Amino acid sequence: MAKPILRVGSRKNTRSASRKNVRKIPKGVIHVQASFNNTIVTVTDVRGRVISWSSAGTCGFRGTRRGTPFAAQTAAGNAIRAVVDQGMQRAEVRIKGPGLGRDAALRAIRRSGILLSFVRDVTPMPHNGCRPPKKRRV
């Protein structure tokens, strides 16, 4: 008969520390991508490595509620809460897109207590590039 294989320890008990290495980040960049359907907030360090991110969809908003200013405010608050715990004090904000959540996300970032060095609008604007799609007929 085959001998039973003894397991030493369980998978649950092996991981004691968190997988993410907690590092002090004094300065960062907050990217806000506000479309009409969703708002995505990404916090990176100055080199561009992602530290934290959140979107209206991950905060539990579904359908048309994802594009609302309140959803953007909630997403920005969730993304920033994690980096404030890691010691971020200063940040620059880059806002992209035409969505309703632009101002609400910026308001939530200001309320978080992080000092903002500047706020920049990086929405891509064509210099009369591609031809737009034909006009919708409803």
Curated annotation (Swiss-Prot):
Annotated GO MF terms:
rRNA binding; structural constituent of ribosome
Similarity remark:
Belongs to the universal ribosomal protein uS11 family.
Could you tell me the superkingdom of the organism this chain comes from?
Eukaryota
Could you list this entry's UniProt keywords, alphabetically sorted. Answer: Chloroplast, Plastid, Ribonucleoprotein, Ribosomal protein, RNA-binding, rRNA-binding
What interactions and quaternary structure are annotated? Part of the 30S ribosomal subunit.
Where's it found, cell-wise?
A: Plastid, Chloroplast
Q: Does the keyword Ribonucleoprotein apply?
A: yes
| InterPro entries according to UniProt | Ribosomal_uS11, Ribosomal_uS11_bac-type, Ribosomal_uS11_CS, Ribosomal_uS11_sf
Q: What are the disulfide bonds?
A: none
Record-linked SUPFAM superfamilies:
Translational machinery components
Name the GO cellular-component terms: chloroplast; ribonucleoprotein complex; ribosome
* Name this polypeptide is given: Small ribosomal subunit protein uS11c
Gene3D superfamilies attached to this UniProt entry? Ribosomal protein S11
**HAMAP family xref list:** Ribosomal_uS11
According to the UniProt entry, which residue ranges have a biased composition of type Basic residues? 9-22
Q: Quick one: a GO biological-process term for this protein?
A: translation
- Identify the stretch(es) annotated as Disordered: 1-22
Species whose genome carries this gene: Draba nemorosa
